[in-house]
Amino acid sequence: MATLLRVSSLCRANRASAFKSLLIRPVPCLTQDHHMVQTSQIHTSPNHHAGSKAASMHWTSERALSVALLGLLPAAYLYPGAAMDYSLAAALTLHGHWGLGQVVTDYVHGDAKIKMANTSLFALSALTFAGLCYFNYHDVGICKAVSMLWSL
């Protein structure tokens, strides 16, 4: 049992003779330095939106629209009409805008590129909504067009 030595015997003056044995590994002395306290500093990025509920409300709105679309699509098939066509145009455009906005947020980097991508996204969403409204007003509408495609 040569490996079982008391720590106090290692801290004494005959420390060198105890370390000559191959079975014994050196053990540091257990002296306590209270004046030397090591602290770690954690640097975090500043939280700019800590008090804002805008992100939470946006997420809730996205989920509410997704759930509303689950009911709106079958209702549009069962009860087609102008109000349903324009509701679908608004809901689908907003759903697509929010979804593509997340793609832009995740994959576009650099201030100028982000501004250009967001401007393009707003233009695309506005053009999509205008095109769907034009189709609803001057043609058969979204509900009737989908039912005509399904009847082929």
Curated annotation (Swiss-Prot):
Pathway: Carbohydrate metabolism; tricarboxylic acid cycle
Record has Transport as a keyword: yes
Regions of this protein lying in the Mitochondrial intermembrane compartment: 79-83, 136-152
KW Transmembrane (keyword) present: yes
Positions of heme b binding: 95
Gene Ontology biological-process entries: tricarboxylic acid cycle
Residues noted as binding a ubiquinone in the record, renumbered to the chain: 107
Pfam families: CybS
Localisation per UniProt entry: Mitochondrion inner membrane
Superkingdom field: Eukaryota
Residue interval of the organelle targeting sequence: 1-21
Mitochondrial matrix face residues: 22-56, 105-113
CDD domains: SQR_TypeC_CybS
Subunit structure: Component of complex II composed of four subunits: the flavoprotein (FP) SDHA, iron-sulfur protein (IP) SDHB, and a cytochrome b560 composed of SDHC and SDHD.
Task of the protein: Membrane-anchoring subunit of succinate dehydrogenase (SDH) that is involved in complex II of the mitochondrial electron transport chain and is responsible for transferring electrons from succinate to ubiquinone (coenzyme Q). SDH also oxidizes malate to the non-canonical enol form of oxaloacetate, enol-oxaloacetate. Enol-oxaloacetate, which is a potent inhibitor of the succinate dehydrogenase activity, is further isomerized into keto-oxaloacetate.
Family the UniProt entry places it in: Belongs to the CybS family.
Name of the featured protein: Succinate dehydrogenase [ubiquinone] cytochrome b small subunit, mitochondrial
